[in-house]
Structure formats: structure tokens, C-alpha cells
Amino acid sequence: MDPIDITYNDEVGFLDDEKRDWKTWIMKLLLLAKKEIGKDNNLEMSINFVNEDRSHEINLKYRDKDRPTDVISFAIEDGEDSIDLAAFKDDPDFQEDIGDLFMCPSVISRHSKEYGTGFDREFGYTIVHGFLHLNGYDHIEPDEAKEMFGIQGKVLEDYGLPLYPDQLDEGRGK
């Protein structure tokens, strides 16, 4: 399976961690997610690490939510404007740009403490969640939520990150 072409914009120094190669960690996790949803074409995306002020600003402007959040997804192809990717399936150079994630490590860290999950698990949960949104998954309706959280849980489990007892049906489980 081809790697995902990820462009990083790190406004907070998250990737400067000397203890872990986050880019490799993220790539391995997202390749599992890509495989789980049956995507075999080339993908490109951006991941932006932002502080709480920037997360709050984006969340307020685009989602009308007056607080910082862990991840915000901006899918390139969504709804009526989607293109038929079948026309490009035989083009080995075509990369589907799925969109942009804005992640706030400090909110993820706070959530990991609130939920008792640990940072790795919460970060994995959050980035897979955003990746699935970029690929058209949602959790507004119960059947959509069950599918999305089921995929999310399987990917986390396959990666060795802990699950809650009802992770495969209910998301965070708390």
C-alpha cells in the first residue's frame, strides 16, 4: 500500500519530540486506517498542529463552537461537489487530496487526562477520527456512528492502542 503524502505544519513544536518519530507513528496508524476503509489509491493531506487559541478561532469561525477542540477536519471532496475518482483509477500519478486536519495537542493531552486514556491512545483516537471524517465518514446518525466508531476501534486495536469495552460501538466509551 502506498504511503500517504502528508504535509505537516507544526505551529507548536509538537513534532520536535526527541523521544518519538511522530511522523512515522502517524503514517503507520493512518495506513492501517486507509487499509481498513478499503482505500488503495494514493492520498494526500495536511496535518496542522495548532495551539488552543488557533483551535478556538477555527472552531468558532467554521463550526460556530466557542471553544478549542482536539481536531477539526476540512474535507476537500464533500457531498455534491465530489468528483468521480473512478476516472483516475488507472493513473498511477493521481493523488486524491482528502483535505486538512487541524489538531491541538494540548486539548488532546487534557482529554487524555479527563478520560484516563493516556496521550498515545487519545492522540491515535483523535487522528484516526479526523482521517475518517476526511474520507467521508460521520457520526451524526446512529448507524453512521456505529460504522465510524467500529472502524476507529478496529484500527486502534490493530495498532495496539487500548480500547474501552464498548469502543467498537460507542466511540470513546465514556
Curated annotation (Swiss-Prot):
The keyword Protein biosynthesis does not apply. It holds the Pfam family YbeY. InterPro entries: MetalPrtase_cat_dom_sf_prd (IPR023091), YbeY (IPR002036), YbeY_CS (IPR020549). Its EC number is 3.1.-.-. One of its GO terms (biological process) is rRNA processing. Its cofactor is Zn(2+). One of its GO terms (cellular component) is cytoplasm. Binds 1 zinc ion. Zn(2+) binds at residues 129, 133, 139. One of its GO terms (molecular function) is RNA endonuclease activity. It is found in: Cytoplasm. The keyword Ligase does not apply. Keywords: Cytoplasm, Endonuclease, Hydrolase, Metal-binding, Nuclease, Ribosome biogenesis, rRNA processing, Zinc. It comes from the Bacteria. PROSITE patterns: UPF0054. It is an enzyme of class 3 (hydrolase). Single strand-specific metallo-endoribonuclease involved in late-stage 70S ribosome quality control and in maturation of the 3' terminus of the 16S rRNA. Belongs to the endoribonuclease YbeY family. NCBIfam families: rRNA maturation RNase YbeY (TIGR00043). This is Endoribonuclease YbeY. It comes from Lactobacillus acidophilus (strain ATCC 700396 / NCK56 / N2 / NCFM). The lineage of its organism: Bacteria, Bacillati, Bacillota, Bacilli, Lactobacillales. The gene is ybeY.
